[in-house]
Amino acid sequence: MEPVNDFQEGISTEHAFEAEPVPSLSETITPRSMVVSFILSVTLSIVAMKVTLSSGFIPSFSIPAGLLGFCVSRASIRILDYFAVAQLPFTRQENTIIQTCVVACTSITFTGGFGTYILAMGKKAAVGDVNAQNNVEEPSFARMITFLFLISFAGMFIIMPFRKVMIIRHRLTFPSGTATAHLINSFHTPQGVKQARKQVTLLFKSFGGTIAWSLFQWFFASGPGCGFKFFPTFGLEAYKHGFFFDFTMANVGIGMMCPYMIVFSVFIGTIISCGVIWPYIESKEGIWYPSNLGPNSLNGIRGYKVFIGLSMIMADCLFVFLCIMVRTTCAMIKRRRQAMQGGGGNAQPFQGIDIADQPVKSFDDRRRAQVFLRDEIPDSVTIGCYVLLSIISIAAIPHLYPQMRYSHVALIYLAAPVFAFCNAYGFGVTDMNLASTYCKIAMFAFGSWVGIKSGGVVAALVAGGITMSILGNAADVAQDLKTGYLTLTSPRAVFISEAIGTALGCVVNPTVFWVFYRVYKMGSGDMGDMPYAKLYRGFAMLSVGDGEQGLPRHSMLLFKVFFVLALALSVFREVASRKEWRIRRYIPSTIGMAITFFMPPRVPVGMCIGSLVAYLWEKMDAGRGRMLSPALASGLICGDGVGSILLSMLTLMGARAPICIKFLSRGDNVKLDAFLATLHDMR
């Protein structure tokens, strides 16, 4: 983009678009934008579901959605031009609507709990739970869709009355939303078109190559333990402990997208957990826990994995939560003081709020505020819709999950507006969505309230799911409103697009999940690890006071020890960052280390390979590496997700791979040859 100098703010974005009229609502939400949104929503929901079920890491789809929305729309324009079909010009506002709709749909993959509380309620996650009789609810397709429609829209309505406070008055940054807006603005300039074309070309190449690779691997995976996924990359001894590369391209793509520190933390956590702690605890088999238990029993080694990892995550979440609250409170007090100093008791919304403390609004601010305030949705309408949704949910949710009472649901919806605003405000200041943290707080509160005998585990998971959905969606809407503000997109158009994407996600995501779940139940799926489902089950069990019952020896002692260690690491990391010590770059993330206690080492191995590729690429060609590595990563993730759906469809249709390829040690190979020779002689 060619920014223009403005005497008040130095650099102006809107001067470059000054000659373009702001499109109306009908020119922004068009049939073209809805068709493109539907195609991309379905595709990226498949990808997000595959990632959340297999690894638990969900990268942001804001940039891929904006990029793909731009390129698919431009391609459709060229096709229609070829057939001489009249059409509206493609604007940045329409691009924003597509991005908003797609992200609203894919975000339900996370807030809908498909990889967390939905699976945590099932029998697979409850293996070894001695009180599982009233604390298990198997996934049901109809119940999932109904539940999502009940809980997914409340956050949208409750955050709308706060939009002017956060966007106009306090001018919250929302870093990810701002970055997405700048990306979309840059696309709609001549320079941006050239860059986007290069990115999309690489994205589709990696997308197609990954699908082809997935289909190629399928031909050699005719049975358990067959295929390239079981290649002993680092030798057979490392393979026995789970250290190998399984050629899952999604993990490589995630590693390319994640910050180096997160990948480094995951690597360190894998070495500590799978290389040191688990081998030591396994050596105590028969002493600390019975030796005849399966790997998924909470009475065995899984009990250590769940509660050690749980303790570290709790410590980090507690520390981050307190830090966010302190920062948010200080920011609000500081801005309030600046406003009072700038204009006394009658300070204008734009005065004394920005860090630069500019007394006069810039051209960009004036134009954006004009559009943002023009198409308003009355607060009475949004509040009324929230109240109506609350009443319906209070009446319906206890019928879907009998462990929840009417009073439980009512209390959640009564407290949600306060916490939704707090979470959205903190999200705007720090770019950290703490919906999952509030979810865990709700789980502890309602799990202890209901109790283990009355189904407290399921009640805790349902309460956490409602909380996470309302707060997570509210923060996402606030961020999308910021993106719309910076691209001159009407807040009414953003809200409508958000509602369409949410409704689409309430149908698409359960359908995609059900396909994966059906394949998994047939014995061919890749959901066996369920890292976050085990984590949420552990949280729920701890909330009902069932933590020590049936668990192996010393598990709760280790819980307390690792809680203290993780808290100390989080404090040390924060202090080092504030003091700007040199060592701060090498202090691992607590949450990054903790999640490795719930996943097999092959996932971090793939992430490390992806991070190494991105690092070497940037070292060799910094400009192209930074510009193209996100596109390559997106193609790998998308291709792996779509490839998984294709393989799942083959399984559902009864197709079987023709070849089995296995990797054996030299001794096992000699024994196998001898056995085959005896069979040949018998013939």
Swiss-Prot record:
Transmembrane segments: 29-49, 51-71, 102-122, 141-161, 200-220, 261-281, 306-326, 381-401, 409-429, 441-461, 494-514, 556-576, 597-617, 635-655
Tissues expressing the protein: Expressed in roots.
Membrane topology: Multi-pass membrane protein
GO cellular component labels: membrane
Domain of life assignment: Eukaryota
Keywords: Membrane, Transmembrane, Transmembrane helix, Transport
Function: May be involved in the transport of nicotianamine-chelated metals.
Name of the protein described by the UniProt record: Probable metal-nicotianamine transporter YSL7
Gene it is expressed from: YSL7
